A protein has these predicted regions:
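Conserved N-terminal segment of class I S-adenosyl-L-methionine
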Residues: 1-122, 170-172, 193, 218-251
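S-adenosyl-L-methionine-dependent methyltransferase catalytic module, highlighting the catalytic core
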Residues: 114-116, 123, 127-128, 136-251
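Hydrophobic adenine-recognition pocket in adenosine-nucleotide-binding enzymes
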Residues: 131
Length: 251
């Protein structure tokens, strides 16, 4: 594909994420490349993905799925629901095209995480970003993620009520940059860390780690939840600023 053909193909899509397809070509996504690169480091640096099976939920244009393949994952499945299914959304086809342009094998599937079950399969790493704020029933979706996780779940989300020690979440509504030409109003939730810890413990994760978002601070949080069968060696990569919310480990 010539540079002119590549540029024409890029301009044919509406991009949610800024993907670097060539040294001098970055898609004009809503989320800037610098933020995505910082998020990739925060989300994936603690993990050795060599040979891993990875599921991404809320993939948008697949930035982190593509990163997982670069980091040696043997299988990567990128999924999204709203950004890939609302009328006029083309984020799934953009993801497929980007994977082709980068010569990276990533499976794509439009999927509502609330419908996930063990029948879908099992993944060493399940990654979910912008999670709670895009789902009317995020707890049901969290159960779905648990059903397909066999080692670690990494989850990034909007947060609120950070000063309250009680587990809680607050309702959120905002325009998201997909669907119609002017975007779509999406209603969801913003949990606080005590709620996230309680939910993840209730679902059987016995080690829960936390860090603030690398560029947005405590307004967004990143959680890594490990199952009892996950080897203790997985904890070695979670150095500061990660903190262990379940130290000493539960159960």
């Amino acid at each position: 594909m010539s540079e002119a053909e590549l540029l024409q193909a890029v301009e044919a899509h509406r991009w949610l994420q800024s993907l670097r397809l060539r040294p001098n070509l970055v898609t004009s996504g809503v989320v800037p490349e610098a933020r995505l690169v910082a998020e990739e480091s925060a989300l994936l640096d603690p993990l050795n993905l060599t040979g891993a099976h990875v599921l991404e939920v809320g993939a948008a244009n697949g930035f982190f799925s593509l990163a997982a393949r670069r980091r040696g994952a043997a299988r990567v499945v990128a999924t999204d629901h709203l950004a890939w299914t609302l009328p006029g959304a083309d984020a799934q086809s953009a993801t497929q095209w980007a994977a082709h342009a980068l010569d990276l094998e990533v499976e794509t599937l439009a999927l509502d995480p609330r419908g996930l079950s063990a029948d879908f399969g099992s993944f060493h790493v399940v990654l979910a970003t912008a999670f709670f704020e895009q789902l009317f029933n995020p707890i049901q979706a969290l159960r779905g993620l648990r059903s397909v996780t066999n080692r670690v779940l990494v989850l990034e989300t909007l947060q609120n009520e950070l000063a309250d020690v009680r587990p809680m979440m607050t309702a959120q509504s905002r325009i998201m940059p997909f669907g119609g030409a002017d975007g779509s109003w999406i209603s969801g939730w913003a949990p606080n860390p005590p709620l996230m810890l309680q939910l993840l413990r209730d679902l059987g994760f016995n080690r829960v780690l936390y860090r603030n978002h690398p560029t947005l601070g405590a307004a967004r949080g990143i959680y890594a939840a490990l199952l009892p069968e996950a080897p203790d060696g997985l904890l070695a990569g979670f150095e500061a600023p990660w903190i262990n919310m379940t130290s000493p480990p539960a159960g």
